[in-house]
Regions:
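Acidic helix N-cap motif at the loop->helix transition within catalytic regions
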Residues: 33-36, 58-67
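Short beta-strand/loop segment that forms part of the nucleotide-sugar
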Residues: 47-55, 72
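Catalytic-site signature of metal-activated, phosphate-bearing donor transferases
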Residues: 82-88, 94, 99, 105-226, ...
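A conserved acidic beta->alpha catalytic loop
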Residues: 41, 53-62, 76, 100
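Conserved donor nucleotide-binding strand/loop of the catalytic core
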Residues: 62-86, 90
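Short, well-formed alpha-helical segments that are part of the catalytic scaffolds
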Residues: 26-45
Length: 359
């Protein structure tokens, strides 16, 4: 074992890898139930711990003091980026690890983290880690596991590339690691996030394409009638905004169609479903049409649209529309019609997809 370790150290020297130093940066508020769980799993992996508190009224700071004396207050301004930037500005080590209080790194992945820390190549500027357990606890994610940027080089070095007509490399060097971070939230943040989206759009902030997609997705997956109604004006503007992409127009129509169906505004409902069907149909709109006809007890027509949602179109916001939700709609409709054998076929398909993890 000692020999293997020595060989490993020699290999690291040969390839130019060095032990890096890491600043852990976190923004927190009222995290007394979970903060110690998070810090206990990551504190010894980092060389500096920076906690930025945005207004805790519980024991959050007291718990944080067990791990660091670098605790800073930040007046909350409904801007997560501003708070994280403030935390990053306090970091002094080579790399910055950004964590949330509802994250945990288990022992297997702590070992992977240590190896990464020992073997980091100096040119790497961002390390992505797998964010796991995302679809538990009523979250609004489409995938149970996905890569997220978590470790960042604090000071970037610019490098010239290409032998003639040389240019500076602008894209960061990103490493996709095998480290898995377990997400263990206490509750859903959807209501908080939707309120923030609404506040910023009302104040005139133009959502970039990524946030436009996330706002629409969170509304479809977790929004209620009130959330959808509050967002309606913003998404109507998106539909008519020539500067928005076709993808954003489709996203807006999905939100507006659902809002109209729930409010029984049929003129608006068919207006926005038609806009999608005349361009490029998607699973979300097919599910909305299925839900409408199911509500009208026209189960044959509803089944057609649920079938289209699963087998003839692709989802653009909510993957479940092209899987679980569409199949469940087919099962309900065929049972209502009295075709139990057909319903069983789709029930078996649903179970198969669940077992394969393809929903």
């Amino acid at each position: 074992m000692i020999l293997l370790y020595l060989l490993w150290k020699i290999l690291l020297v040969i390839v130019g890898a060095v032990m890096i130093t890491i600043s852990l940066c976190m923004i927190v508020k009222n995290e007394e139930k979970i903060l110690e769980r998070c810090l206990g799993s990551v504190a010894d992996l980092c060389d500096e711990i920076i906690i930025v508190d945005t207004g805790s009224t519980d024991r959050t700071k007291e718990i944080a003091r067990k791990y660091t004396d670098q605790i800073y207050d930040f007046v909350w301004i409904d801007d997560f980026s501003a708070a994280r930037n403030f935390a990053f500005s306090k970091a002094t080590r080579e790399y910055i690890y950004s964590a949330d209080a509802d994250e945990v790194i288990d022992e297997e992945n702590r070992q992977r983290f240590r190896l990464m820390k020992e073997a980091m190549l100096p040119e790497i500027e961002i390390v992505q880690m797998k964010y796991g357990n995302q679809m538990q606890y009523d979250t609004v994610y489409n995938y149970d596991e996905e890569y997220r940027p978590k470790l960042f080089k604090r000071l970037r070095e610019f490098v010239w590339t290409e032998p003639i007509h040389e240019t500076v490399r602008l894209d960061p060097v990103v490493y996709d690691s095998d480290i898995v971070i377990t997400h263990l939230p206490e509750s859903s943040h959807a209501k908080r996030d939707l309120a923030n989206f609404h506040k910023h759009t009302v104040n005139g902030y133009r959502l970039p394409k990524r946030l436009h997609n996330m706002y629409a997705r969170e509304l479809l997956m977790a929004g209620d009638n009130e959330d959808l109604a509050q967002a309606a004006e913003f998404f109507r503007d998106s539909v008519n905004d020539e500067a928005r992409s076709s993808d954003e127009m489709l996203e807006a129509c999905c939100v507006l169609a659902k809002s109209a169906r729930l409010n029984k505004d049929m003129a608006e409902f068919f207006k926005y479903t038609a806009k999608v069907l005349t361009t490029e149909a998607c699973s979300e709109i097919c599910c909305e049409l299925g839900a409408f006809y199911e509500g009208e007890r026209d189960f044959e027509e509803a089944a057609i649209w649920y079938y289209n949602a699963v087998y003839e179109t692709q989802p653009i916001l909510q993957l479940a529309c092209g899987g679980e939700l569409g199949l469940e709609g087919l099962i309900r409709c065929y049972r209502a019609i009295g075709l139990s054998r057909q319903a069983d076929i789709y029930r078996q398909e649903l179970e198969r997809r669940k077992q394969e993890g393809s929903l």
